Amino acid sequence: MPAKTHKETFLMLLSHAREATEKASKIYDELGGVIQDPQVKDALEARAFVSQNILTKIDQCFKIIGEQPAKLSGRLHETFLEDFRKEVAEMQSPTAKRLFVLAKLGQLTHLLIAEYEVLVAAADATGHYGVGFLLESCLADTLVFADRTRRLISGIVEIRVAERKGVEQAA
């Protein structure tokens, strides 16, 4: 659907955010199946739960503006999963897998953050301040997840560095 007006552009972007959030929830489930780290699994389960709440908020946005999500044809998330499956299958190290999964989570999360940032501005520009408020809360949830993911990565790296120092000191 080519967008010709600000409203059509907003509807297309909101539809894309809904689809991306829905697909991201499925990706979180698949990523969680690859990793054995309980902290990462917990984070993914929590994120999947929060994603369902975000979908509810986005659906409310559509209700407020009196529209339905548009049909989209993008394959970004399918390609993301295909590439992920190929790359992670070749990894042997559990630590490398954990970091890889978290890096992929970071990529996916930052795509969502960018979408929500634009949507908040677009909602305000089109006069849908209630919608902007709901989208801002979606953005906040996603920013928290990005920060938590960053902290998980830091924790894994700190443990790995400490292990290396212990080996070096023992030698």
Regions found by a protein language model. Give the residues of each.
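Amphipathic alpha-helical hairpins
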Residues: M1-A171
